Amino acid sequence: RAAYDKKNRMPKQLASRRIGLLFDMNNYWEMEFQRQTDQWWTMPHIHKYYNLLKSFAAPVDVISEKEDFSGYPFLIAPAYQLLDNNLVERWTEYVKNGGHLILTCRTGQKDRNAKLWEAPLAAPIHQLAGINSLYYDHLPHSLYGKVDFGDEEYAWNNWADVLTPAAGTDVWAVYADQFYKGAASVIHRRLGKGTVTYIGTDTDDGKLEKEVVRRVYKEAGVPTEDLPYGVVKEWRDGFYIALNYTSDIQEIAIPDEAEMLIGSARLEP
């Protein structure tokens, strides 16, 4: 209590990582009703992105469309299948004004009534995300496809949006096999003062997704941490709190100038 100061504000470096994670129950219910494949689970898909963001020590707020997006340097909408043109316009303005938007597979494929658009698949987001066209594939349990991102190869078999990018859109990752070998898996474009990244592939281990999101932060000039999975570091009212939810002892880096009030850098389970 003696160390508390009501004037404390979130450190600038931490605030620069802040991200809003967009979630809607109607979207969740509809996708669980029509999963398309027994390997798709909506909530684990969302949790995967939440967990990788927490490993960056990024402040994550789970928000609804009612919130003002402009307060977040980064915004992610995982598998946001149900939307309308109004939401796409809000996303577009957010990006033009300097926000960094991340969309993932299955986003925008249906309207608010869960009807396919009378247009190409996910047509409302094409201009925003820099997509010319897309279709999707998913593989059986026993077969894994491959994606090349940077110098690494990643396995997938849950879901793949196969993307044809529009002119001016950068391709960050491509499918390394199947009949669409060489097609885009992850695309990225600049729009106004901000960026849009579309991650078309869903993997089991999330390693591809983690490296893509890490690059989004890096391209934006925002440093991230790399906490072990299951270790969470939070900030509130001037205090950092580190929690270890794993079964093993974990070590975290603590600045030399920090004052340790409770515990140590060695976190017991």
Residue ranges and their predicted role:
Residues 1-269:
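Carbohydrate-binding surfaces of carbohydrate-active enzymes
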